[in-house]
Amino acid sequence: DSSCIIFFMSIVYLVPGNMTGGPYGLKELKRREKLLKDWSFNPSKVKVYDVPNGGSSIESSYEEIASIIPAVDRLSEITKYENIDAAILGCFGDPGLDVFREMFDFPIIGPAQTSMHTACQLGHKFSVITIFDSMLNMAEKQVHEYGLDHHLASVRAINIPVLELLKDLDVTYKKMSKLADKIVNEDRADAILLG
């Protein structure tokens, strides 16, 4: 006789900016929600939210810091009507991850921290592709804060703004592919993170 325990989890994915007010709108929010639902274990509940009074994208240290308080306030608001077991911060910069963990009593996952640690399990070195050269130092600092300097092969920039990545997919894929070749062949990375 074997028994199975099924855990129900309620997971919130919070985009720390105003995605619905941007060029990709509600359609992108729903696309992410569908992906997360497809990837999650049944009978988990996954809901994607954004921050209506947040910026349209996070492409600098200033925008990252400016996103934290509105995002924390938004998650606080959501907890008033949702029973949350865990949350995912929907930005590779993990803006305010420590603040979120301080403010809430459920696990908060940062995609950069999580993917960097996962990359270390998949290979010896990883690289990060970020959006602008101006963000190279931010990404390197983040790797350092997570204690993974010795696993970092490189940080390179695609130099396409977040809100334009999906505008011309051929251009984005060609630039991404060219960077990936350099990362593998010149930097000797085993894994590549898109951030």
Briefly describe each language-model feature range.
Residues 9-29, 126-129:
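Short beta-strand segments enriched in small/hydrophobic residues
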Residues 67-99, 103:
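Beta-alpha junction/loop-to-helix N-cap segments that form part of ligand/metal-binding clefts
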Residues 14, 84-91, 188-195:
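Periplasmic-binding protein-like
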Residues 142-195:
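Active-site rim beta-loop-alpha module in soluble metabolic enzymes
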Residues 101-122:
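Short, acidic/small-residue loops that bind anionic groups at enzyme active sites
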Residues 31-44:
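A short, Lys/Arg-enriched amphipathic alpha-helix followed by its capping loop at the start of a domain
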Residues 49-69, 163-169:
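N-terminal beta-loop-helix "entrance" segment that forms/cooperates
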Residues 60-77, 171-179:
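Glycine-rich, highly charged phosphate/nucleotide-binding loops
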